[in-house]
Amino acid sequence: MNARLPPPGLIGLLRPALLGTVCAALAACNDAAPSAQLPGLTLLSAQDVAADPMPGNDDTLRRVHYRDLHGEGVLVLERSAAVINDPTGSGSLDVAILTARLYVRSGPRKGWTKLWQRQIRQPCAGPVLEAAWLLQHVGATDLDDDGQAEITLASHTFCGNGSDPHQLHVSLIDGSTGYGIEGETRLDAAGQARFDGERHQSPSLASAPPVFVQHLEKVWSALGDTSTTHARQAH
């Protein structure tokens, strides 16, 4: 089996806050979806937006556009690739890069400001490299009804062969505070995903509002089913 670097660490990315939550209560949304009203939060569609440039480019996988008490926000999700030198000196490594950026503005026609950027980088010597945002679990919500949007991100990464685990990452950002869970899932002999290996939680989750903990646990449980499809496609 080819050498494999350790999987990317989500917990380290949570400083100072890691990364849309389930759009409109665990329903996927996209640029063409209609507006959805949530307590203290409005999810916006392309039809709601004035004809001015939006953050992102043609390679953007998903935009989640919302309005909360601070103004407008747009979460932009992308996936890119790179090649780096192997630190062991044995050639090169492919790298899959998942990038999430949050842009905000105080009102229509105002300029967009990038509030934060988060990346998950998966280097791999092969034979299989995967990295994907799990878009059905990404969006914006106002779970604690304070008028400020929280952002949830969910993703999966993989490097290796059929016996190697898939890494799962889920996180929620509320203002400047991030909460996250990461762990592993494998395919069993029947081709079903199962959680095993270590599971890590960000230290901040111990003091998180219960509604945030419940939300993250619900998304985490759903990732096992979602990752089965990705795992089967990889092998």
Task: Indicate where each model-derived feature is located.
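Bacterial N-terminal signal peptides that target proteins for export
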Residues: 2-18
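Acidic, small-residue rich beta-repeat scaffolds with periodic aromatic anchors
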Residues: 30-69, 166-168, 173-235
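Acidic/hydrophobic-patterned starts of short beta strands in beta-sheet-rich repeat architectures
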Residues: 70-78, 144-155
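Surface-exposed loop and turn segments in beta-propeller and other repeat-based domains
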Residues: 114-130, 190-201
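Short consensus segments that form the blades of beta-propeller domains
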Residues: 84-95, 126-131, 158-164
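Structural signature of eukaryotic scaffold interfaces centered on beta-propeller domains
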Residues: 63-70, 137-145
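Repeat-based blade/solenoid architectures
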Residues: 48, 55-61, 122-136
